[in-house]
């Protein structure tokens, strides 16, 4: 399976990504050079060229719903490339109630444009005791952390799904904690109820996705931050997808029927989720996805205008790099560490050859190739332009 991404700048030969197996891809470039555009390009190809893969876009800017619209703005350019403008079916996932997040007018407009709009809610029982403590920034060796950890651990022992009211009840019934500790912890749990991201009944993640659409998770409606709700949603969702694909892979190896497809996870502004030099709620999960995801059929594409701000463990595991224009010393230095002997020169030497928006250095470690590429125009509307 090959994904058409553009042409070599000099000889105009078509350039493809070999997607016959799981891949880990870095798309980077300073603002306005095309990294989000390129990410959308790969999403289009995955949707068009595969029938056993679910594309899931983590969208921190609220711009990828525009993939449902045709790229009328570049119709002439598309014609020159022999490509036809096209809108794609989009399943827009919203943490919480879409009407509360967007307003009724926006919801109606989305649906009038053919966009399928669905809430995504988290199962509280999918989070570990440590995860709950991290969410509230609680030390598990101090009273509130001890109380919450104990409550989640005891609920897990029943081996059945549990919800926020169950956690609240467990804390209220804790005879080992002081009233002051319980009151402070209950205030935090009531605050979590107001976030409107936790389910009141069990949610099967896969029933939220649509295998026939591009799945876009709009986390722009949530507060940012390394320990904010965006990271929480990505962490819980990613862990569940990883677990289910591991189970599916075991069945595949035994020749048994599998209902859980492979996943390509696309993350824009990835430095907010796997930051260099600091932690986040989603960081450990995403590093595991990059390191161990190939075997269960999990691919990832991380995009950032600040590659130096992405954890080095993620960068070093990427087997494809699509680098647009980069100028800051920190970013160039970070990318240059990815240089390999087969390149014949340091990566920064190739980056300096980029002259125009939409051009990129394409490095494929599996093929041991380096190419200067002009990224093909998008078939669908790009939502990343400035107002």
Task: List the predicted regions and their residue ranges.
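P-loop NTPase motor domains
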Residues: 41-57, 61-288, 295, 352-368
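N-terminal pre-Walker A segment at the start of P-loop NTPase domains
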Residues: 1-14
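Conserved P-loop NTPase motor module
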Residues: 25, 356-387
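Pre-Walker A (Motif I) flank of P-loop NTPase domains
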Residues: 20-25, 211-215
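Conserved ATP-driven motor cores of ASCE-family P-loop NTPases powering translocation/secretion/packaging/pilus
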Residues: 44, 289-370
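Conserved lysine of the Walker
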Residues: 35
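Walker A (P-loop) phosphate-binding loop of P-loop NTPases
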Residues: 32
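Hydrophobic positions on the alpha1 helix immediately C-terminal to the Walker A/P-loop
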Residues: 38
């Amino acid at each position: 399976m090959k994904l058409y991404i553009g042409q070599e700048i000099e000889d105009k030969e078509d350039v493809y990504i070999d997607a016959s197996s799981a891949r880990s891809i870095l798309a980077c470039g300073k603002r306005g050079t095309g990294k989000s555009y390129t990410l959308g390009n790969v999403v289009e190809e995955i949707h068009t060229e595969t029938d056993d893969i679910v594309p899931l876009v983590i969208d921190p800017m609220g711009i990828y719903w525009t993939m449902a619209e045709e790229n009328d703005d570049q119709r002439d350019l598309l014609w020159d490339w022999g490509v036809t403008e096209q809108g794609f079916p989009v399943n827009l996932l919203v943490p919480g109630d879409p009407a509360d997040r967007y307003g009724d007018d926006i919801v109606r407009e989305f649906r009038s444009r053919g966009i399928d709009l669905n809430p995504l809610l988290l199962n509280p029982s999918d989070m570990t005791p440590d995860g709950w403590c991290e969410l509230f920034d609680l030390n598990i060796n101090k009273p509130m952390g001890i109380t919450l950890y104990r409550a989640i651990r005891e609920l897990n022992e029943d081996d059945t799904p549990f919800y926020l009211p169950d956690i609240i009840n467990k804390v209220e019934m804790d005879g080992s904690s002081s009233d002051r500790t319980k009151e402070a912890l209950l205030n935090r749990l009531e605050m979590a109820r107001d976030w409107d991201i936790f389910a009141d009944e069990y949610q099967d993640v896969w029933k939220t996705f649509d295998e026939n659409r591009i799945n876009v998770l709009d986390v722009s409606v949530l507060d940012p931050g390394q320990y904010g709700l965006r990271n929480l949603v990505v962490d819980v969702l990613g862990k569940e997808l990883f677990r289910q694909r591991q189970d599916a892979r075991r069945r595949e190896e035994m020749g048994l029927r599998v209902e859980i497809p492979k996943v390509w996870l696309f993350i824009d502004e990835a430095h907010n989720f796997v930051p260099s030099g600091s932690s986040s709620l989603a960081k450990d999960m995403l590093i595991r996805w990059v390191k161990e995801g190939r075997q269960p059929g999990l691919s990832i594409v991380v995009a950032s205008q600040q590659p130096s701000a992405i954890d080095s463990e993620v960068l070093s595991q990427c087997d494809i790099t699509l680098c647009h224009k980069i100028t800051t010393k920190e970013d160039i230095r970070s990318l240059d560490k990815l240089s390999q002997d087969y390149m014949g020169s340091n990566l920064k030497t190739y980056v300096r050859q980029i002259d125009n928006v939409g051009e990129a250095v394409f490095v494929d470690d599996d093929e041991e190739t380096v190419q200067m590429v002009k990224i093909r125009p998008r078939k669908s509307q790009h939502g990343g332009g400035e107002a």
